[in-house]
Amino acid sequence: MARKPIAADTKPAPERRSAAQFLPDVQTIASLKEAARGCEGCDLYLGATQTVFGAGKRTARVMLVGEQPGNEEDLKGKPFVGPAGKLLDRALEDAGLDRDETYVTNVVKHFKWEKRGKNRIHKKPNAEEIRACLPWLHAELQVLRPQVLVCLGATAAQALLGRDFRVTTQRGKVLRSELAEYVVATVHPSSILRQQTSEDRERELHALIADLRVVAGLLSGDS
């Protein structure tokens, strides 16, 4: 007697959570920011004070993307206002770029952290958390359509340009992409702050400024 075929499990796979479920129908930066306040696309919202959405000029030609908000950003609700943000401001100014003319944001909109004593210490988001949050960043890019997209650090670069992208070997290079007319990757300013000596910090800061001067050159048509 022939065996009866074993019935396949037809139970549908559970839907993967993501920010896509929270995107507004009509998308502007204002409507995206408002919708993101209630995002529960991953569990990071549980430990964060608030959503930290992008900020800056709505007609900005340059969009800078980091990894995630830090402790100060989480408390204040604004991106790049902590020590790394202050260093970024200095680098932008030295490169001939005005932060007020840019738009700054992060791949992940909630602060991921672990407690050490009384402090909340940054913890890198994992691949699933990045995937879940990316719809916000893609929507920001779609609305703003920047001329130059600057990826600050490996998390931003690999989230947008692919997991094989290496900032160490491709930083400062001008790339073409569907994301923006030009894409330039460089280090995240927080990596400079982690350098052990003042000489190392100064050297890495000058390298960041050099990368940002490439961006300034693109805006002026010099590159």
Where are these regions (language model features)?
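A polyanion-binding, active-site-adjacent surface
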Residues: 2-223
